[in-house]
């Protein structure tokens, strides 16, 4: 209820009143403002503040996770770079210099054999037939064929080089003979460079 001091008019705050003394003139009675209880205001602030705190904590956690992720990514990239360096070794210039030093110590005969070694290689079809006949398995892919041919080429190179060492020890010259190959094979077998049989022979 609202009380008008100029007239003895009582009216509710939601009603429009007129009186005989024309004190209100069909004007709405102003409403009184309700002040908040201090305790209620404090409770409302406490209810709103946890949300802001949670949002702040979530933002901090996201920032920390992002920072950790970036640090881990940088460390991973660094490890990959170091791993690549260990695989490739030195830079191309250093490798070329080392190779040049090794080649400079070759004799004319060794250089000729090295050039022949670089140009030579096993035929792909022949190696494929040989491996398929030995293993009895299906046709091998191109990658395996390249690996097998590379290993066979290295073994033949070691065999020839050791045979030349045998010839120098025996003070012999000329082409390599079967006796030199047999002695070279025996030495390589003693050095563990010849793979051992996994299955024993049935007949000697």
UniProtKB/Swiss-Prot annotation:
One of its GO terms (biological process) is RNA polymerase II preinitiation complex assembly. GO terms for molecular function: protein heterodimerization activity. This is Transcription initiation factor TFIID subunit 11b. GO terms for cellular component: transcription factor TFIID complex. Expressed in roots, leaves and inflorescences. Its main location: nucleus. The keyword Nucleus applies. It comes from Arabidopsis thaliana. It comes from the Eukaryota. Component of the TFIID complex. TFIID is composed of TATA binding protein (TBP) and a number of TBP-associated factors (TAFs) whose MWs range from 14-217 kDa. Disulfide bonds: none annotated. Pfam families: TAFII28 (PF04719). Gene3D superfamilies: Histone, subunit A. It is found in: Nucleus. Residues 38-60 are annotated as: Disordered. Residues 42-58 have a biased composition (Acidic residues). Keywords: Activator, Nucleus, Transcription, Transcription regulation. The gene is TAF11B. Residues 106-195 form the Histone-fold domain. TAFs are components of the transcription factor IID (TFIID) complex that is essential for mediating regulation of RNA polymerase transcription. Belongs to the TAF11 family.
């Amino acid at each position: 209820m609202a009380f008008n001091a100029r007239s003895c008019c009582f009216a509710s705050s939601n009603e429009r009143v007129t009186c005989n003394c024309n004190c209100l003139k069909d004007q709405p009675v102003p409403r009184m403002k309700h002040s908040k209880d201090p305790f209620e205001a404090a409770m409302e602030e406490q209810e709103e503040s946890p949300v802001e705190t949670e949002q702040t904590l979530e933002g901090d956690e996201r920032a920390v996770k992002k920072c950790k992720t970036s640090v881990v990514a940088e460390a991973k990239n660094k490890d990959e770079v170091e791993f690549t360096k260990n695989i490739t070794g030195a830079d191309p210039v250093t490798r070329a210099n080392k190779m040049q030093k090794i080649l400079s110590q070759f004799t004319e005969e060794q250089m000729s054999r090295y050039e022949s070694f670089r140009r030579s290689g096993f035929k792909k079809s022949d190696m494929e037939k040989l491996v398929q006949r030995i293993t009895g398995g299906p046709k091998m892919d191109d990658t395996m064929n390249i690996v097998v041919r590379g290993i066979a080429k290295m073994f033949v190179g070691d065999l020839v080089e050791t045979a030349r060492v045998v010839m120098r020890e025996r003070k012999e010259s000329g082409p390599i003979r079967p006796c030199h190959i047999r002695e070279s094979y025996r030495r390589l077998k003693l050095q563990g460079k010849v793979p051992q049989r996994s299955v024993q022979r049935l007949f000697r």
